[in-house]
């Protein structure tokens, strides 16, 4: 079956590409902090500059990491900050049938296979210094052990089958970071779409949900830049619309680590929303001086447009 003949069931049908639709997609692993606010603000401003729609999607399918009540706390913080989505928020955990349907489509075109390897076995199979050094976000480069069969092992996970050599190279133009290229076979190998614990991998879930919601533009942190080629590859396999990407610099702590709950990020102070917004804008290269939130947003939208113009004429 050719890629052009792929048809999704209605549950995973992609909305047609049209006017700008962006989104902020936090995971409910803790309260909103300055690092995630930077991404939320950038995505909101980008939607406003382009006269588009801004959505919020709670990416809560990694149930082991979810913090009870964090989703509602994040939404409450966004509302206090004036970042209110144009449509009702969605929860990724409500979309599991979409992901199953996408997996079935990939299996139908022989781009999916079961894997019985453990992480320890994969690590032990990587013996050269060069291979050990080629890790992306602590993702082991899969050597393809189960490509031709499980060899008596029980299936643990499901992996996408990549093409060989240069056919596995994906390039895209990031609106902030510039042209990016990655050879998926060399950088990550056949990557997991459904994990051994039954959880869905981020790569397949975000691709399917973005398409279903008609997302045209993704604005997010540069820590996810490395994931983008995998997502573009899946979009192409599934015949989904292309998405434009903009990856903003991540906020780091004094040790140079990405600011997160694990590295001591503090929750946004909802009693001082203007101060939080001003700090987030500064991380984006925007110096906004305003007496109130209305004045902040009135100044921030044209400031973001000017910031984009400094990056690239096509932004």
Curated annotation (Swiss-Prot):
The residues the record assigns to binding L-glutamate are: 23-27, 59, 202, 220
The GO molecular function terms of this record are: ATP binding; glutamate-tRNA ligase activity; zinc ion binding
The entry's ATP-binding residues are 261
Residues that bind Zn(2+): 115, 117, 142, 146
Which regions span the lipid bilayer? none
The note on cofactor binding and number reads: Binds 1 zinc ion per subunit.
Q: Briefly, what is this protein's role?
A: Catalyzes the tRNA-independent activation of glutamate in presence of ATP and the subsequent transfer of glutamate onto a tRNA(Asp). Glutamate is transferred on the 2-amino-5-(4,5-dihydroxy-2-cyclopenten-1-yl) moiety of the queuosine in the wobble position of the QUC anticodon.
| Lineage, uppermost ranks | Bacteria, Pseudomonadati, Pseudomonadota, Betaproteobacteria, Burkholderiales
**What keywords sit in the KW lines?**
Aminoacyl-tRNA synthetase, ATP-binding, Ligase, Metal-binding, Nucleotide-binding, Zinc
GO BP: glutamyl-tRNA aminoacylation; tRNA modification
Which first-to-last residue range defines the signal peptide? Answer: none
The sequence motif named 'HIGH' region is recorded at 26-36
What cofactor does its activity depend on? Zn(2+)
Q: What EC number(s) would the UniProt record show?
A: 6.1.1.-
- The name of this protein is Glutamyl-Q tRNA(Asp) synthetase
As for family, the record states: Belongs to the class-I aminoacyl-tRNA synthetase family. GluQ subfamily.
């Amino acid at each position: 079956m050719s890629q052009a003949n792929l048809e999704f069931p209605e549950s995973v049908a992609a909305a047609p590409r049209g006017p700008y639709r962006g989104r902020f997609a936090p995971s409910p692993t803790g309260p909103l902090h300055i690092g995630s606010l930077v991404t939320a603000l950038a995505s909101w401003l980008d939607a406003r500059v382009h006269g588009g729609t801004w959505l919020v999607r709670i990416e809560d399918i990694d149930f082991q990491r979810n913090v009870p009540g964090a989703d509602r706390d994040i939404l409450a913080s966004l509302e206090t900050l004036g970042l209110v989505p144009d449509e009702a928020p969605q929860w990724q955990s409500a979309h599991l049938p979409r992901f199953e349907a996408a997996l079935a489509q990939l299996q139908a075109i022989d781009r999916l296979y079961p894997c019985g390897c453990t992480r320890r076995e994969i690590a032990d199979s990587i013996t050269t210094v060069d291979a050990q050094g080629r890790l992306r976000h602590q993702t082991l480069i899969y050597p393809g052990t189960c490509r031709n069969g499980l060899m008596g092992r029980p299936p643990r996970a499901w992996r996408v089958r990549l093409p060989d050599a240069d056919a596995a190279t994906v390039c895209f133009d990031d609106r902030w970071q510039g042209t990016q290229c990655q050879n998926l076979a060399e950088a990550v190998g056949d990557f997991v779409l459904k994990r051994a614990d039954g959880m869905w991998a981020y790569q397949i879930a975000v691709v399917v949900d973005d398409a279903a919601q008609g997302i045209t533009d993704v604005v997010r942190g540069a820590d996810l830049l490395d994931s983008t080629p995998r997502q573009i590859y899946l979009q192409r396999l599934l015949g989904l619309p292309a998405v434009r990407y903009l990856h903003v610099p991540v906020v780091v702590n004094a040790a140079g680590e990405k600011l997160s709950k694990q590295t001591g990020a503090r929750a946004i102070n909802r009693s001082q929303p203007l101060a939080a917004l001003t700090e987030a804008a500064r991380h984006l290269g925007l110096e906004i001086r305003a007496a109130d939130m209305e004045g902040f947003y009135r100044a921030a939208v044209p400031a973001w447009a000017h910031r984009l113009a400094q990056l690239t004429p096509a932004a």
